[in-house]
């Protein structure tokens, strides 16, 4: 199937986009990557890589020209600490990116367009209990996302639906549930919970200070999906004959306290949890994968333990370099 197909991955300098480029190249696609920045941790193997600001219409026209398919991953986003404090910027920037990229794809005759949405579209009123009922795709309505990031994702889902209905572009919509793995943001405020926990545990191990800070009581729940499963699922959905939103995540829920213990077990270190005030997001969130299994005949297979075992050593190495640099004598 990939022979002769040319694809665009927007957000190709970011965590999921970078891994997706590598996955698609391994399958034989010709890939153009576009982002505001190059990948931070390893070079992209895209056939072409362009540094473009996709908030600008003319850049979106350039990025989507001469291609068959678009994987739309570009977004201004981060972990809960970031999205809870930057509502206006997120709504403004992501609205421009998605409006312009989708319309430019239509203008340039792109045949198929996959939009990466998020579990943040689900209403807050369905996620008030840590022992949350797994979220089905139809649970997004009546709409009440917790934050601007979720609202923008939901509106962009509708935009894709109407572009398919009105203009005939074949759209696909995937809702991510907490994707993690190596070569992703691990510090600076935009990192997600698994990367943040790996960083904190690594710092505890390398400095000898066992205290690990956790926002809130740590009993908020989430499910976490490893990056290799994520990019495989994205490609399977692009090839499937299905245009409604589809969850992509693990359906095993853990508390943040449990996540901390799991990372500590991988690191081989005893930690002391210190609960502090901080943004916690919704109380509970988990993916219902019933429709995913029906549509793709597949679901994520890599366990949380295995994913953490693949992720933690990479982050520990980077934390170690940072600790060493901080302890080096100044001249």
Protein language model regions, located:
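C-terminal substrate-binding subdomain of Rossmann-fold SDR/epimerase-dehydratase oxidoreductases
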Residues: 23-26, 52, 203-331
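Short-chain dehydrogenase/reductase
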Residues: 91, 95, 145-157, 187-195, ...
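Active-site Tyr-X1-5-Lys
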Residues: 144-172, 196-206
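Rossmann-fold cofactor-recognition segment
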Residues: 44-57
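N-terminal Rossmann NAD(P)H-binding glycine-rich loop of SDR-like oxidoreductase domains
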Residues: 7-27
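Conserved Rossmann-fold NAD(P)-dependent oxidoreductase catalytic core, especially the SDR/UDP-sugar
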Residues: 99-146
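Flexible, glycine-rich beta-alpha linker
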Residues: 121-123, 172-194, 221
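NAD(P)H-binding glycine-rich loop region in Rossmannoid oxidoreductase-like domains
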Residues: 54-94, 104-107
